[in-house]
Amino acid sequence: MAIALYMDVHIPQAVTEQLRRRGVDVLTAIEDGATEVPDDELLERATQLGRVLFTQDIRFRAMAQDWQHQERLFAGLIFGHQLGGTIGQFVKDLELIALASDSDEWRNAVEYIPF
């Protein structure tokens, strides 16, 4: 019943490390060799892997909304505003999301954190 997360290249490593300590399945774009991949390809890659993308890049939010209007499938997007939360808040919210939801709930969904 848990979801897997895919971290955009700009997410602090501390978020990934703390989530892994809590048992959350996390893959970073860096680990996946996707550090210089265009945004649309990164969202597509996360979708191919069945992972919800977490980003702080506002361009992803607009792109995901465009994909929703086009009915183009993606695995889900979680947007964390850079000035809107601390690492601890992001970890807490992402852990809750990852462990309490499933991939079907996230299909073509966009969510904003911190809550």
Model-derived segments and spans:
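Acidic, metal-binding active-site segment of PIN/NYN-like and related structure-specific nucleases
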Residues: 39, 47-64
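Acidic, PIN/NYN-like endoribonuclease modules and their adjacent C-terminal/linker elements
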Residues: 2-9, 13, 17-21, 34, ...
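Short, surface-exposed connector motifs at secondary-structure boundaries
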Residues: 1, 24-25, 48
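Conserved BB-loop
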Residues: 25-37
